[in-house]
Amino acid sequence: MSETFSPNLTFTEGFVLGQASFLIILLLFIRYVVFSPSEQIDHEGWRKRRAERADLLSNHTPPPLSNLLSKTSYDMSIHPAESSDWVNVLLAQILQGYRNDLLSEGGEEGARQRIEGWLNPKGENLSWLDPIDVTSLSLGTSYPLLSNARIRPADGQGRLRAEIDVDYLDSLSMTLSTAVLVNFPKPRFAVLPVTLGVELVSIGGTMSVQLHEPIEDRQHIHVNLLPDFHLNLKVTSLLGSRAKLQDIPKLEQLIVSRLRNLVQDRFVHPNHISLALPRILSPSVSSTPILEGLGEGAVDAMKDAVSDGMKRMVEDFMGENPVEGALNGQGEEQWLDDDFPPTPLVQPPGTFPTLSVSSRQSHRQSLPPSRPQSTTQGQPQLFYRRPLIHPTQSYPHYNTYTLDPQIPHSVSYRHPPRGSHVHNPPETPVPQRPSHGQGRMSTTSSLTPSQSQSQFRFRGQFASGVTPGQVGTSR
């Protein structure tokens, strides 16, 4: 006769034992599989191995420029020259901004005084020259025009450059007045008044824009004029006090030659203006790299958003309301002393509106959070609290409060149906007479649905206005 084995554990004990075994296995899996070992990590060795791996991966050969042209669908042999009208607009705005800066204080007179300050730096007066006075100044009204932009080979090493025709026709003029001093045999022994006028009539040529190899881990754009440029200047001169010499040819040639050499030495190929591009992974002109600055800004924005969201969630969950503190705190008496009628506020869903009484007696009583008080006339007043909601959201069912005339000082709340459209809360509830067959008085919004929806509708700062064809159309 065989004996049958009967377990000693009950169902509850077996269930608990099974759950405990599952939890132990889960904890062991997380401890030894998910988490890293608790041994001390060799940080120095890890950094060295990472640096060696970065050195091996840094030997990257850049693709040839022909690959760049093929991927941008640009064929230098057949591609026509392009218009640069959009660049002209941007360049005109930049130049007009500089003109506005000079003319911002006092117009041309203020600009003249500024240029005089630049021409006469403090502590650097010349012994043989009087201070320079700017007698007239004209900043012009035209803008440089760029045209015929094309890509051309820069040298025999496969580099490319953009060639753009530039023309500037205007009348930039400035007239200077000073005096040349002869300090021998004594200071200011002789004084020769000099008046010079320089006018820029036109300048033009071919501008070259080329991206050069990195210098000190930074890429640079070189901008210059090709040697076939033209410069048209007009110079007027006036020397002497009583007997004056006007427009001396030699002096005019000397000034034009000096100004042309200045342009030649600064802006004409092989000389150039170098514009450094900002770095991405290393410090640029500012002490903070671009990606690092963007990363810090993104982290700060996320921190603020998370903290604000958590704060709002906690306040909504706990039922805290800054309006309630204002009503029950120190500002209650001052609020009751106001001669204007109180503005009904909005109560969040799931709670009941607060009934309070604005008593005009000398003895002020604190308002309880949810218990009504009666006035001398026996008519309570409603004070609805405003919920903590986002400005772009609103809840139409906040206004559906009703008063039951059969029960004194009673307030009921009616939830809206699910899926109802979201509207803005009204500014002031307007009581309406009960319809035939109903014994309740409801409060409705004084705003139309279209006005309520458009009150907090987001419109970007740069959003374009509604076109005439879109007025009155439904979305």
Swiss-Prot record:
Coiled-coil regions, chain positions: none
Location (main, coarse): endoplasmic reticulum
InterPro entries referenced in this protein's UniProt entry, alphabetically: Mmm1, MMM1_dom, SMP_LBD
Any one of the GO CC terms: ERMES complex
Cytoplasmic-side positions: 36-475
Skewed-composition ranges (Pro residues): 341-351
PANTHER family xrefs: SMP-LTD DOMAIN-CONTAINING PROTEIN, TEX2 PROTEIN-RELATED
Cited function: Component of the ERMES/MDM complex, which serves as a molecular tether to connect the endoplasmic reticulum (ER) and mitochondria. Components of this complex are involved in the control of mitochondrial shape and protein biogenesis, and function in nonvesicular lipid trafficking between the ER and mitochondria. The MDM12-MMM1 subcomplex functions in the major beta-barrel assembly pathway that is responsible for biogenesis of all outer membrane beta-barrel proteins, and acts in a late step after the SAM complex.
The protein, known as: Maintenance of mitochondrial morphology protein 1
Species of the source: Cryptococcus neoformans var. neoformans serotype D (strain JEC21 / ATCC MYA-565)
Lineage: Eukaryota, Fungi, Dikarya, Basidiomycota, Agaricomycotina
